[in-house]
Design a protein with these regions (language model features):
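Short basic helix-loop element that most often maps to the first helix and adjoining turn
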Residues: 5-20
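DNA-binding alpha-helical recognition surfaces that contact promoter or target DNA
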Residues: 9, 23, 34, 51
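Residues in the helix-turn-helix
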Residues: 20, 31, 45
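DNA major-groove recognition helix of helix-turn-helix/homeodomain DNA-binding modules
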Residues: 26, 43-61
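Recognition helix of helix-turn-helix/homeodomain-like DNA-binding domains
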Residues: 26-41
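Helix-turn-helix/homeodomain-like alpha-helical modules used for DNA recognition
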Residues: 58-79
Length: 79
């Protein structure tokens, strides 16, 4: 599940700002920013954002005790 906290953590792992995430996910950067500030996302938008993270080797972690992101593998630059 995508949460604002997990999204921020994943962006941090990748060194991405909201504009970079928006471009990678094919959504407006303002949508990314608004979500992190409490506005809900459509399911389809959340799926695009999660796919962009997965493409970079980042998995989101959300359970009862923790929220964040882990880097499962790193893509080589230019790959």
């Amino acid at each position: 599940m995508l949460t604002p906290e997990a999204q921020r953590a994943a962006r941090g792992l990748l060194g991405w700002g909201v504009r970079e995430l928006g471009a990678a996910a094919g959504v407006a950067w303002t949508t990314v920013s608004q979500f992190e500030n409490g506005r809900p996302l459509r399911q389809s938008t959340a799926a695009k954002i999660m796919a962009a993270f997965a493409d970079q080797g980042v998995e989101l972690v959300t359970d009862e005790d923790r929220t964040g992101a882990v880097l499962v593998y790193a893509r080589r630059k230019g790959a």
